[in-house]
Amino acid sequence: MYVSIEGIDTAGKSTQLNILEKTFPNAIFTKEPGGTALGIKLRAMALGGEAKSSIAEMFLFLADRAEHIEEVIKPNKNSLVISDRSVVSGIAYANQFEIDKLIELNLIATSNILPTHIILLELTPEELKFRLSQKANDSIELRGIDYLINIQNRMKETIKKLNVNHIFIDASLKIEDIAKTIEDFLNVK
C-alpha cells in the first residue's frame, strides 16, 4: 500500500506522520521532494532558486518524483509506504500550469504509479490564519492565506481527477481524532 499524506503548510502533516510512525513501526516512511539521494540534491536546487524558470523548476520536481518511484516505491511495492507529500502536492504547487497537463507529465514521471490511499488534511481560511500567526513563516507561507487556500483547492481538484482512494479530513479536529480517522481509513491493524 502506497499512502500519501497531503496538506498545505501548517495542516498537521508532520504531527500525523509522527503518530503513524508509532502506529505502523514496520512501514517505510519517505517524502517528496527529497526522499532519495538524488532527490535531496534536486530539492535543494529547486527550493534554493537555482532554476530561474518555473518550467525548469517543475521539471526538477518531476525528476525527483521519477527517482522516488524507482528508488523507494517500486522496490517496496509489497510493503506499507507512507509518504509526506506526493504527485498531488507537485501538481498543486505548480499552479501556473493546467492541472490536466501536469497530470500527464506526472504519470510519465511515475510510470503511472500513484498512491493507493491519499489523505488530505484541510484547513479553513480562519484556522490557517490562526496557525500562521503562531509561528515564523517560510517563503511559501509568506505568500499568504489566499495563495495557500488556492493550493489546497488545487490539491482537492487533483485528487478527484486522479480518481484514487482518498479522504479529506478537517485538520482543525483534535489530533487524536484525526489519527483515528487516518488509521480507520488505512484499515491496517
UniProtKB/Swiss-Prot annotation:
Family membership: Belongs to the thymidylate kinase family.
Organism: Aliarcobacter butzleri (strain RM4018) (Arcobacter butzleri)
One GO biological process term: dTTP biosynthetic process
Record-linked InterPro entries: P-loop_NTPase, Thymidylate_kin-like_dom, Thymidylate_kinase
One MF term in the entry's GO annotations: dTMP kinase activity
Coiled-coil ranges per UniProt: none
CDD domains, per database record: TMPK (cd01672)
EC number: 2.7.4.9
Enzymatic class: transferase
Binding positions for ATP per the UniProt entry: G7, I8, D9, T10, A11, G12, K13, S14
Cellular component terms (Gene Ontology): cytosol
Assigned keywords, A-Z: ATP-binding, Kinase, Nucleotide biosynthesis, Nucleotide-binding, Transferase
A matching Pfam family: Thymidylate_kin
Name this polypeptide is given: Thymidylate kinase
Catalytic activity: dTMP + ATP = dTDP + ADP
